[in-house]
Amino acid sequence: MGMRMMFTVFLLVVLATTVVSFTSDRASDGRNAAANAFDLIALIARQNCCSIPSCWEKYKCS
């Protein structure tokens, strides 16, 4: 393989690595946002549950 061909392969590998890394970061941001939304919903549900006596006894709200 010539020097020019090796440099081209190197650039393609760097580009592919960058694309994979960028899309992985974007996907993890989406998962984090979904997890944060779920945590918020669970917190609100628990706060509402603590105002109901039968639910309060079941889940031991403090």
Curated annotation (Swiss-Prot):
Residues 22-46 form a propeptide. Disulfide bonds join 49-55, 50-61. Residues 1-21 form the signal peptide. InterPro entries: Conotoxin_a-typ. The keyword Secreted applies. One of its GO terms (molecular function) is toxin activity. GO terms for cellular component: extracellular region; host cell postsynaptic membrane. The modification Pyrrolidone carboxylic acid is found at residue 47. Transmembrane segments: none annotated. The keyword DNA damage does not apply. It is found in: Secreted. Alpha-conotoxins act on postsynaptic membranes, they bind to the nicotinic acetylcholine receptors (nAChR) and thus inhibit them. Belongs to the conotoxin A superfamily. This is Alpha-conotoxin-like Ca1.1. It comes from Conus caracteristicus.
